[in-house]
Curated annotation (Swiss-Prot):
Its cofactor is Mg(2+); Zn(2+). Keywords: Amino-acid biosynthesis, Cytoplasm, Histidine biosynthesis, Hydrolase, Magnesium, Metal-binding, Zinc. Pathway: Amino-acid biosynthesis; L-histidine biosynthesis; L-histidine from 5-phospho-alpha-D-ribose 1-diphosphate: step 3/9. It comes from Saccharophagus degradans (strain 2-40 / ATCC 43961 / DSM 17024). This is Phosphoribosyl-AMP cyclohydrolase. It is found in: Cytoplasm. Zn(2+) binds at C80, C97, C104.
Amino acid sequence: MTDSTFLDEITWTSDGLVPAIARDAKTGTVLMMAWMNRESLSLTAQENIAVYWSRSRGKLWRKGETSGFTQHVKSIRLDCDADVIVLDVEQMGGIACHTGRESCFYRELQNGKWVATDPVLKDPKEIY
């Protein structure tokens, strides 16, 4: 079992959360941003599988529990201000976004408009 004292070094929001950025461990591509609470970060550190806190559902969210696209955690990093987590992950199935794309950051600002630049790898209707 992991020693949980590392959790005390994090600067949590007033809601008891910390933003967590998941990126591909091999390519460095930013896949998504989600929130973690103490329990989800502790579980992630213990199991090496990404577990987040769903603010909309008010419960733990095991990434990939519905889609099968889990994130196997290779490393957990804390920024210099101790208020942002970065997870280096192996994204199972190559899809992190509920839109069926590799990354949730698939839109790019071009000439003042947001343009979808990354392809849909799988129709979300086939995933969920």
